[in-house]
Amino acid sequence: LLTPDGIRTAVAALRAETGTDRMCRLVIYPEHISADVMVDGSNTRYESWTYRPGEGATKGIIEGTTSPTQSPFRAGAFDWDAVPALFERAVKELNVMDITSRYLVVSGADPTFGDPMGMSAYLSNGYRHSGYLAADHRGKVTRVMPNDEEY
């Protein structure tokens, strides 16, 4: 699912089930997507949803309210075509060898600290080495946080 088409398919399935693409958190793994989808008419309440290929979108058991560092965003505002290049750059720059996990975290603007909405590409391995690239909603990298541990 970590492809532009995979993400678009999942977001479309979530929108078909929930009636919206407004979320406060979206985490995209190769096998599934977890989303905190905003409740209709609210800027603070959300419900958890999951998308898996072959199963579609399913509502989870978690309901909650946004934290002071979260705000709603529209999934359609992100340039999903930028995702492959983010992960290509992450592999080159994050100093994570023997990668066992990769995922993308998408979040709205942070009203507390003033960070804009964006997406972060994470890599990690079985030795607890990890790093991430943070980018704006168009895919422009704004921060590189490589693994700094010795191999």
Where on the chain are the PLM-derived regions?
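Long, charged/polar, surface-exposed segments that mediate recognition or autoinhibition
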Residues: 58-100
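A short, surface-exposed interaction/processing loop segment used at functional sites
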Residues: 53-75, 131-151
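Ampiphathic alpha-helical segments that act as solvent-exposed interaction surfaces
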Residues: 4-12, 80, 87, 151
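Secondary-structure transition/turn motif
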Residues: 37-41, 64, 122-124
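Short glycine-rich, low-complexity/disordered patches
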Residues: 15-33, 92-114
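Charge-rich, low-aromatic oligomerization/scaffolding segments with amphipathic character
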Residues: 43-50, 132-134
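Extracytoplasmic low-complexity, Pro/Thr/Ser/Ala/Gly-rich segments
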Residues: 1-47
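Extracellularly exposed regions in secreted/surface proteins, prominently low-complexity, repeat-rich
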Residues: 97-151
